[in-house]
Amino acid sequence: MYALEIEHLKKTYSSGTKALKGVDLKVEKGDFFALLGPNGAGKSTTIGIVSGLVNKSAGSVKIFGYDYDTHQAQAKSCIGLVPQEFNFNQFERVIEILVNQGGYYGIPRPQAYKRAETYLRQLELWDKRNDMARELSGGMKRRLMIARALIHHPKLLILDEPTAGVDIEIRRSMWDFLTKINKQGTTIILTTHYLEEAESLCKNIAIIDHGRTIEDTSMKTLLSQLNTETFILYLQSPINDTHNLKSHDLSPFDIHVLDENTLEISIHEKMQFNHLFKLLTDNGIQVLSMRNKTNRLEQLFMRLVDKNRNNSELIETLEQTSHTENLDG
């Protein structure tokens, strides 16, 4: 049994817009799963359907075995949703937002209060418990929405751009919290524009584009498709004529001199870093520090999306041709 199982999901709005043309997803229990795609790909529609906020046109959705068509109440009780927008009463006190949310799920106030205290402390909001929501910063509001989504102890937590507009320090603390609850058994689905976030947190990934699933695999398998990575090396002393960057030993590497103290080197993923640094040292080059220039997930993401768009244009052309032929017939 999967935490989330989606098959042939389609959605056509009353305007005629086809938001989803066949999305298939399987999310294992206990997974930390990334759902990515460019703007307009269908991510928000998919999340809306899974959360019970949008009606599907076709296909099936199961949450921990509960089919939305036959057991919607049970399916929805398994889900906690953190949407992009701040959709709570800005003039309500923080603690009351959480306790009242618990009431929607039949949780007695004393029990809801204890849960609220636990999450507010973990998310560093306890000292704000009696503040109005409107008095919170953007980052605090994001954390409040996570606490609200967790108040009924859902098995599946869905986060739609949870760290948008949040500074780096708060983002890191949110990552730590989400990693902790995932290790405790909560299945998490994350959509984000911060691809570093997906790469750091998620075990598995699906990419949606033009309303279709174009990739559904493990993060490790996806990243293994990269052949090269590019690094910026900062040197202890300037490059001079005694340094042989064109030596036979360094020939497998693509080396560019950015300035007298900086090199850009592209290496094959199977080459060893230790071997590279030994070769540089042997050729009189001492490295002070380095950084990875390649955003690996972004590189793969763009490659897959570009490939899919070419395929989508072909599919749509064939579908239109078939439709025209049927009308003529």
What are the functions of these language-model segments?
Residues 157-160:
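Catalytic Walker B motif of ABC-type/P-loop ATPase nucleotide-binding domains
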Residues 132-136:
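Conserved ABC ATPase signature
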Residues 153:
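Conserved catalytic motifs of ABC-family nucleotide-binding domains
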Residues 1-6, 11-22, 72:
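A short, flexible loop at the N-terminus of ABC-type nucleotide-binding domains that lies
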Residues 99, 103, 110-128:
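Conserved ABC ATPase "signature" region
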Residues 175-267:
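ABC transporter nucleotide-binding domain
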Residues 59-67, 74-75:
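Conserved ABC transporter NBD signature motif
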